C-alpha cells in the first residue's frame, strides 16, 4: 500500500552513496593512483563496507582500518579465526558502535569467499589471509578513547568526539603494527596518505566533553536550529496491525 524502505546499514542503497566520499577523500589527499589508508569507526560495519565497495570499484586503498569499541568480536575473529558474537552488546562511550554482532559482517565475509548466516554461524570460512592483508582492526576502550580526545586537543587543538577518537587511536594502532613489522620508528609514520573518519559533532556529547576538558563544545548553527524545534511524536504499542493502520491513516 505504501512505498516504504528502510535506510539501515544493510541496505545497499545506503552503502553505494557512502562509497562515493572515499573517492572524494582520495581525490583530495592522494596523488592519482596512490594508495590511501582509511580508518573508519565501526559498529554495524555499514560505513566500512562503503570503503570495501569503493576498493572493489577500483579505488587504490592501502588499508581499511576497522577500529571498534569494547564490542571486540571482529578484531578477535580477524586475529584468531574464531567468531563469537557478543550478546548483549557492551555499552561504551562511542555509543553508535555498541554492536555485538555487526549485520554487515556477513556481507564482508562473502566478499572474501566465505558464508555467514544472520546468527553469526560460519558455514564457510573466508580467506582470512586476504582479509588481514586488506583490513586491520583493534578494540579501543573508553579509557583510551578519553585519553585520545585529550591528546589530540593538546597536540593539535582539534576536538574529537568519541567515535572519531576511536578511529584516530585505531589508526595509531595500525601504524605501530606497521612500524614494528618494518623495524622503523613510530615517528616515521606509514608513508601513505590517510583519512580518519568521524561520525558526529562533539556537541552531541556535551557532558562527556565537559568532564574531560572542563568546558562544553560549541554547538554548530544547524544543531542549534534543530534543538529549538518542537518535538512531534506519537506513541504506539508493539502491535503490527495497529502500526499498519497508523501508517495507512497517516499517509492516506
Label for each model-derived stretch:
Residues 182-185:
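Compositionally biased, intrinsically disordered low-complexity segments enriched in Pro/Arg/Gln/His
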Residues 1-179, 189-252:
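PLP-dependent amino-acid enzyme catalytic core
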Amino acid at each position: 500500500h505504501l512505498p516504504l524502505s528502510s535506510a539501515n546499514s544493510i541496505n545497499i542503497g545506503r552503502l553505494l552513496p557512502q562509497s562515493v566520499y572515499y573517492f572524494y577523500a582520495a581525490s583530495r589527499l592522494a596523488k592519482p593512483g596512490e594508495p590511501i589508508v582509511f580508518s573508519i569507526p565501526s559498529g554495524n560495519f555499514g560505513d566500512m563496507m562503503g570503503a570495501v565497495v569503493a576498493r572493489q570499484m577500483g579505488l587504490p586503498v592501502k588499508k581499511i582500518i576497522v577500529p571498534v569499541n569494547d564490542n571486540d568480536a571482529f578484531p578477535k575473529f580477524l586475529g584468531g579465526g574464531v567468531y563469537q558474537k557478543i550478546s548483549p552488546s557492551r555499552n561504551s562511550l562511542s555509543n553508535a558502535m555498541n554492536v555485538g554482532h555487526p549485520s554487515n559482517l556477513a556481507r564482508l565475509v562473502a566478499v572474501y569467499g566465505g558464508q555467514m548466516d544472520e546468527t553469526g554461524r560460519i558455514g564457510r570460512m573466508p580467506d582470512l589471509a586476504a582479509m588481514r592483508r586488506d583490513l586491520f582492526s583493534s578494540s579501543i576502550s573508553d579509557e583510551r578513547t578519553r585519553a585520545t580526545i585529550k591528546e589530540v586537543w593538546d597536540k593539535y587543538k582539534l576536538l574529537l568526539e568519541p567515535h572519531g577518537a576511536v578511529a584516530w587511536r585505531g589508526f595509531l594502532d595500525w601504524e605501530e603494527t606497521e612500524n614494528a613489522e618494518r623495524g622503523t620508528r613510530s615517528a616515521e609514520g606509514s608513508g601513505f596518505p590517510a583519512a580518519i573518519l568521524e561520525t558526529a559533532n562533539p556537541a552531541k556529547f556535551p557532558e562527556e566533553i565537559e568532564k574531560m576538558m572542563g568546558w562544553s563544545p560549541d554547538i554548530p548553527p544547524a544543531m542549534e536550529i534543530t534543538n529549538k524545534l518542537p518535538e512531534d511524536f506519537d506513541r504506539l504499542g508493539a502491535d503490527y496491525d495497529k502500526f499498519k493502520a497508523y501508517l495507512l491513516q497517516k499517509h492516506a
